[in-house]
């Protein structure tokens, strides 16, 4: 098993529901450590840049509009197989398909407002973490 890092975003709908602490508890109980975190209100430019891979998809404008509709919490998580573990904790993209007890099953309303984002691969995790955090902003968790 490899120690990995992944990017996680608590989206505006979950921030508005005031479930940040509950989501963090799930990360930590699963063995993921928060090594960087920040609350921010994404600009349109930031949201478009982050989700540029989806630029030609029909949902792109709605996704960007949603992501700038309120503050988000962006964090880098670290742990054994962090990418896959985080995706398991989040649940399926569509909360209707998400397993009971996952973040999306418990806190998301729809596929459009689905509470959280997580990197889909180790390669993308590195790119996504670098989008939001400078290397010196990531704290080693050795204790």
UniProtKB/Swiss-Prot annotation:
Give the matching Gene3D superfamilies: Nucleoside diphosphate kinase-like domain
Q: Which family does it belong to?
A: Belongs to the NDK family.
Spell out the HAMAP family in the cross-references: NDP_kinase
GO biological process annotations for this chain's record?
Answer: CTP biosynthetic process; GTP biosynthetic process; UTP biosynthetic process
UniProt lineage: Bacteria, Pseudomonadati, Pseudomonadota, Gammaproteobacteria, Chromatiales
Which positions are catalytic residues?
117 (pros-phosphohistidine intermediate)
This protein's gene is called ndk
| Protein's recorded name | Nucleoside diphosphate kinase
Enzyme Commission numbers on file: 2.7.4.6
Q: Which residues bind ATP?
A: 11, 59, 87, 93, 104, 114
One Pfam match, given by its short name, reads: NDK
Localization recorded for this chain is: Cytoplasm
